[in-house]
Amino acid sequence: MLRFIIFFSLFIHLCVAAPQTPAAAAAVPAKKWLTLNGQEPAVVARGGFSGLFPESSASANDLAIGTSSPGLTMLCNLQMTKDGVGLCLSDIILDNATTISSVFPKAQKTYKVNGQDLKGWFVLDYDADTIFNNVTLVQNIFSRPSIFDGQMSVSAVEDVLGTKPPKFWLSVQYDAFYMEHKLSPAEYLRSLQFRGINVISSPEIGFLKSIGMDAGRAKTKLIFEFKDPEAVEPTTNKKYSEIQQNLAAIKAFASGVLVPKDYIWPIDSAKYLKPATTFVADAHKAGLEVYASGFANDLRTSFNYSYDPSAEYLQFVDNGQFSVDGVITDFPPTASQSITCFSHQNGNLPKAGHALVITHNGASGDYPGCTDLAYQKAVDDGADVIDCSVQMSKDGIAFCHDAADLTASTTAMTIFMSRATSVPEIQPTNGIFSFDLTWAEIQSVKPQIENPFTATGFQRNPANKNAGKFITLADFLDFSKAKAVTGVMINIENAAYLASKKGLGVVDAVKSALAKSTLDKQSTQKVLIQSDDSSVLASFEAVPPYTRVLSIDKEIGGAPKPSVDEIKKYAEAVNLLRTSLVTVSQSFTTGKTNVVEEMHKGNISVYVSVLRNEYISVAFDYFSDPTIELATFISGSGVDGVITEFPATATRYLKSPCSDLNKEQPYAILPAEAGGLVVVADKEAQPPASAPNPPLEAKDVIDPPLPPVANLAASNATGGAQSHPPPASGTVANAANLGLSLLAMLALGV
């Protein structure tokens, strides 16, 4: 079928990049796992790669096998048709995962299932041919791609077994309900003679006991599934919380248990981890394996994980105290890389690639940006280069802060609302600007963690949203020397405005601070000077140890030689947006530019920014996984550095042996094929093609010479004295800013 031809072309690079022999794996020290049997935890794909494609579709199953570690287990949720055919579908009700409600709009029914009345379209009301010939699958989680809806057929159990997955797990959720309606999952399994079925799980004790002898003869493992602690198990009429009190009794009919992950690592109401329970230790003591369910890259889970799905897996398999025996996941490649590549690293492996990990305002995904805590976290997380965007106070103090406007990342609005002004040379909206406040006034406000995705309800580490303190440029440089980081990046913006309108020489302030720190006279630590103004970079030409970085803050589609030649007059590197390297439309990558290659031909290094962990900022092609995005830019595009708000994620990837595609190994973290996923969908379902980004023009690189610093020193030397704008303009500014002020106060909870 054409669909499969296209689908497999998407992943043909797997055959190219995968090792031909696992011989090199022998050089890797064997890992010691704290599982029941000491073996590596299993990766169990719930319905294949159901995080992208509809659950248990052929595409979901094929992609799971093609992108996961070799020992993958495929999980199928068994549902039964009226004529006794077994299907792989997420639930007994079909309307959330198929097109059945539009095919048979008046066929809705109500059944009592495990004591509850459920309304919908039930699979047992239809024979298999009706399902296969009329009904197609849809994605049943609305944050996931919908462009594949209605294009993929429902899979029978035999269809999935026919793909010969490494291991196969059948989940039987509703035995008692089916038995009430004269359908027997046990007899269905006997008709298959349990062939190819490695694991069977169920939340019903009676069902597991009924197939115990048959499963034993077939060497099929039986797993008892725990539901919500307050739910009632149908056979015993006991709550699952009661059954949990006697795990040893489960050993009589099962070899392991499957539990929601919060049975092991509970999360409090503020979405932070509570101490681990003793569930795994208790189950292992009883001789039971423990499998944890509920893993997905696109779920909002504990803030402790910093939106990094790999960090969550590691919490369950590599915490130094215990390890679960397997994880049930909708994104099997992420589980595979976490277990195979990231576990037992202990932070001491050398980085596999040469790419630099450069921070964006320190570890600003975890703490307010440009604070002492954000920088300390960045160092702890292994960042190579920490950055300081230099702002100037009214009294001439250079300090680190993301922008001249303090409203988004401080509590300035609650104190200095009346000082909001309009500076169109800097931004189109009103703001409270650092150059209108003294350093003492700036220190009187609290930092505030920035949430780029607040509009979608995403928060960042709210327990520390106002933690830390601002630091001066001089203190930042002292810190970087004391911590012996590989380098620092000093970002300079608005230099012309500050010099001509405010009498503040930010370039001179940076030069002076670097000279006092002696970083201008050594080669041990890198010094990167970044600006979007070529004249600023030109002023640092006389200091050879510095690497000058031109920040290009617009999307470009190419870098012709004249433009690259112009850049070389001012800079040795560029900082480019992600979408200048890989184009994206509606969260799908659509293509790859040649900008990196064109820059490299001119001996210009390329850094890409800004990388974030939140899954809504990560394209579907990257599997909603920030690690795959890193691999795409580093291994795929060949960038020289990544600028990130979550340096721990980037460092973990680069320290993993799986990031080095030149080594033969059983598993590798591969870059995504830009534009490869969207073509799997029918043409009419694909997002509309967008116009290509224009190439960078040479004239876009050139900026006017910097003006001299205006002689406003006398007014700027008044310390804490406040200079108010003229009444007329001040009134206009305050009135224009009233809406902004009220919105900011509401956002801050004032």
UniProtKB/Swiss-Prot annotation:
Q: Could you list this entry's UniProt keywords, alphabetically sorted.
A: Glycerol metabolism, Glycoprotein, Hydrolase, Signal
Question: Which reaction equations make up its catalytic activity?
Answer: a sn-glycero-3-phosphodiester + H2O = an alcohol + sn-glycerol 3-phosphate + H(+)
GO MF annotations for this entry?
glycerophosphodiester phosphodiesterase activity
For this protein, what is the EC number?
A: 3.1.4.46
- Tissue expression per record: Expressed in flowers and siliques.
Q: What class of enzyme is it?
A: hydrolase
Domain GP-PDE: from-to ranges: 41-339, 355-654
Recorded superkingdom: Eukaryota
* Underlying gene: GDPDL7
Q: Which GO terms describe its biological process?
A: glycerol metabolic process; lipid metabolic process
**Looking at the Swiss-Prot or TrEMBL record, what is one Pfam family this protein matches?**
GDPD
User: Which residue spans traverse the membrane?
Assistant: none
Could you tell me which InterPro entries the record lists for this protein?
Answer: GP_PDE_dom, PLC-like_Pdiesterase_TIM-brl
| Lineage of origin | Eukaryota, Viridiplantae, Streptophyta, Embryophyta, Tracheophyta
Q: Which residues are glycosylated?
A: N134, N304, N603, N716
Q: Would I find Cell division among this entry's keywords? A: no
What organism does the record attribute this protein to? Answer: Arabidopsis thaliana (Mouse-ear cress)
Name of the protein? Glycerophosphodiester phosphodiesterase GDPDL7
The record's family statement is: Belongs to the glycerophosphoryl diester phosphodiesterase family.
Query: Span of the secretion signal?
Result: 1-17
User: What Gene3D superfamilies is this protein classified in?
Assistant: Phosphatidylinositol (PI) phosphodiesterase (3.20.20.190)
